């Protein structure tokens, strides 16, 4: 969006800032329900916990879509970026997280600039949505486990430590919560079952209040959002953990322009034409 370039450069007045990330949203979020879900998840990320970690100077992953780095912070670690290996295998995705941690480990800050905002294409199909989340989860596990093993994580502020650790153990904590709820607390009556679903949906709505302030109508997709969050936190993350060293982009192919579910035909072409004319 207008002003991104000017705004994203502002934090570099501090010589200790090595990387700056921007706020991001889904392009044409209303063109598909899975884009709405993705935009909700992105909004929660960039309205809530990324600014908090950025204020502390340690965003654990400056998203590669619009990451800006200080040149002198990148050049010394370039070889480690281009030749990343995990458990003996060369990594071909997840370079944004890798570079973020290399810069953090070099003593620089990684921050967030909310006034710089970019729109990005996201998948319009459930299949592509799932594959994208699998790739992101694999990248996160490799990146964060490396940060833990090398000791980089322990030198970051508390809020970054606790956020990264929470991301790593989400399948365990959510799995145990649902197991306890179903097998120890669930009263198999209509009221009991309704209460459980109401708790799941209401809880997700409270956690997404920042998105609902901007998009009140998203309350209508709250059940779909709750399903997507459980899907990502449990089966997808569990599968990604077990296959974290399986390399691949999943949503992009050599014989294809653009990612799966991200072609021009998935957009509202009338809106695109109006924006081009404008």
Locations of regions flagged by a protein language model:
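Membrane-embedded multi-pass helical conduit in multi-pass membrane proteins
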Residues: 162-248
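Cytosolic juxtamembrane C-terminal amphipathic helix followed by a basic/polar low-complexity tail immediately after
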Residues: 248-278
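Alpha-helical membrane-protein architecture signal
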Residues: 126, 130, 154-161, 220, ...
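Non-transmembrane catalytic domains and loops of membrane-associated enzymes and transporters
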Residues: 1-150, 277
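Charge-rich, acidic-biased intrinsically disordered regions
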Residues: 155-164, 229, 251-260
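Loop-to-transmembrane boundary segments
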Residues: 19, 155-166, 267-273
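Short juxtamembrane and helix-loop transition motifs at transmembrane-helix boundaries
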Residues: 149-160, 184-188
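C-terminal, non-catalytic tails of nucleotide-sugar-dependent glycosyltransferases
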Residues: 139-155, 237-244
